């Protein structure tokens, strides 16, 4: 079973009538076998759909139009089995609005040395057929992924899956609706941004709602549904006897369950995939949602604290991209440092860290929240699972959006954190904290990020290219002087690119 159950990537093979029916029959047969192999492979998480070989400008244009109008098609894979004159592709590529990958492969891995003849050469000529197609893509300035290698190799299939996941994320971005309850935290700069420009570039919509509308949805939740929700909490988390045995704590938990159910209903009925709130805008609420927000993220919703709709969008998009993979994705904040033999970052937030990144079964506890509405708030406590991760931040620079990515190594804390009443993750940024933090600051990266152990750097690279957005990467090879030069060069390129 594929992780993406209703989404598809179309496989389109290019050729021409010049070769005659026998060769074209072989081309079609080989294409069908490749598609079958992809669908049988556990490495590729989305259904690949075979489309008949295209041999003329009219056929190419028609299949590109069909891909555009198919809601389940998130992208297309294009392969030139033989030579397919590239002028035939101009109208179709001009029309194509879905992302496309150029797969530079051939059906047979090895040459049949003792049997090879000109018939074989004319049938299996992607080595130069794909170069012809590559030229027209470059000439038309089409952003695309190029994957090179035999279609059965694990490396090629991993690259295909990365791109397919990015295409699914891009499809989600085009259809995503984000609900904002309240506004940005007052006087904060980086969470601001041009929502119209974001919708033009990324596709997602951001809509504001009053707390009164949300409170109405919460008030409408039946007490019986709240009781059933508490039973779910007891079965899914570590819960001390004192929580359910203490009348006050139980009341706080019931209020939190009611918030979760009301918020879920509001978002679901409105077709929203992500939301934001702000501790400064909680009129009528019993408190800042803690457990409720954590569970909504665990169920796939994106979230951004303090009105941060850009991060909420990225959390949702990355959750979609990571479907079926080990590891989770969460809203996150660089909170405090541990300077020592190896400098580290303790990431957390007031309440809202997703349990999908937890190293062990989370504990459900009630603790005092002292910012905004000061009250006792139920929340899940855990530390993040050790392993590779990334932090991704999207910022608005006024004339463009920039995505900043830092590769991390999450580690197990050397000691317990018995007095910390929030979930957290401890990581070592690559190449080290000194370089990573300086680069992040030079790039203008936010204090919020989308943290993930399910998503790879390559997937974010593919997504950024689909979006036409600037991406800068901080990894083991980053050097500050080179990184600052990259930022300067990007400023020139993206400033000129709009007019080219």
Curated annotation (Swiss-Prot):
Its cofactor is Mn(2+). The keyword Ligase does not apply. InterPro entries: Ara_Isoase_C, AraA_central, AraA_N, AraA_N_sf, Fuc/Ara_isomerase_C, Fucose_isomerase_N/cen_sf, Lara_isomerase. CDD domains: L-arabinose_isomerase. Its EC number is 5.3.1.4. One of its GO terms (molecular function) is manganese ion binding. It catalyses: beta-L-arabinopyranose = L-ribulose. GO terms for biological process: L-arabinose catabolic process to xylulose 5-phosphate. Keywords: Arabinose catabolism, Carbohydrate metabolism, Isomerase, Manganese, Metal-binding. Pfam families: AraA_central, AraA_N, Arabinose_Iso_C. Mn(2+) binds at residues 306, 333, 349, 448. GO terms for cellular component: cytosol. Pathway: Carbohydrate degradation; L-arabinose degradation via L-ribulose; D-xylulose 5-phosphate from L-arabinose (bacterial route): step 1/3. Binds 1 Mn(2+) ion per subunit. NCBIfam families: PRK02929.1. Catalyzes the conversion of L-arabinose to L-ribulose. Belongs to the arabinose isomerase family. HAMAP family: Arabinose_Isome. This is L-arabinose isomerase. The gene is araA.
